[in-house]
Amino acid sequence: MPIVQFGNLYYFIYIFIGILLTLLVLRFLKHKSQKYRYWFLFGLLVFNFIVHIGKIFIPMYQNNVEYLITKVSFENICAVSAILFPFLYFTKNKTLKDYMVMVGIASGVITFLFPVDAMSTRFNGLDLGVYRHAFREIENIRFYLSHYIIFLVPFLMMHYGMHELSIKRAWRAPFMLILVLVIIFINELLMTLFGWVPKSELFDPNKRNPSFIFGVVGSLGGLGMILGIFVPSFLRVNPFYSGPAFFPVLWLVLPAIVYGGLIALLMMLIYDRDHTLRFFHLKHKLKLPEEVEPIEHE
């Protein structure tokens, strides 16, 4: 059975499809007006919102999730994006729009490079014991499509000059990410309070564990080791849970600041290169032109 595994043919097929679709969309929008592009992107966000909500009708959810409402809540970072991006798209708040752009592009790219859900036998905190068919399992297609749109819209916003990133605001992005993790934690508490998630599973990293807010699955290896470098020992215990687990959300604060900061810096070097080099006093050393627009003070 064809399944998606890291580095195999089907893994690269999905990446190729994503790149091809991006080129086709760019070609389609090339001679369209800016107004058309603006509403076209909003239409994509609305479509993705429907894709996110509509997943409760997919057999994998119908057969393995007792309370389907838990799967259309703020259960992870990308779910928050799918739900909130149609609203953030219209915001005048530059910090919120920065978050939308940076997290959208980054999470979309990371998902295609490391499609954990598509490669795993786990679903909703359960090990189903079988891998998903690369193309016949509709959840796989939905997974890739939704994350692709989460990437595509912010990418096109930047490509067509609908938003501008600024190195002066870059420091805010990791803290916005931490705020979203807190929202996910509150969402999980509410799901438990309403009886939609068993209390015994609330803090268990081997169950739902949305966006790893309760720790990593298994030992500190792989992803756990990458995140765990910046986690002090006192945050590697959870006083509210008897089993092995990390302190909810707080254990992710330093990793979010470090890795989120690096991603934000990379975005600035791509989209606000001149101002970023000036900010770090590198422009003269790299012998780049000095003619740049003034850095906005926000």
In which residue ranges do the predicted regions lie?
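Aromatic-anchored segments of alpha-helical transmembrane domains
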Residues: F47-I56, G104-V116, L177-L189
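Alpha-helical transmembrane segments in multipass membrane proteins, preferentially the mid-helix core
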Residues: L20-L26, A82-L88, I149-R169, V182
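Membrane-embedded alpha-helical segments of multi-pass membrane proteins
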Residues: Y11-L20, K71-A82, K97-M100, L113, ...
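Membrane-proximal helix-loop-helix units in multi-pass membrane proteins
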Residues: L88-V153, M158
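Membrane-interfacial loop-to-transmembrane alpha-helix junctions, especially the N-terminal start
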Residues: K32-V46, T95-V101, A173
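Short, highly charged, low-complexity non-transmembrane loops/tails of multi-pass membrane proteins
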Residues: D274-E298
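Short juxtamembrane and helix-loop transition motifs at transmembrane-helix boundaries
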Residues: M1-N8, L29-W39, G54-L68
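Membrane-interface transmembrane-helix boundary segments in multi-pass integral membrane proteins
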Residues: I3-Y14, W171-L179, M191-A264, L288-E291
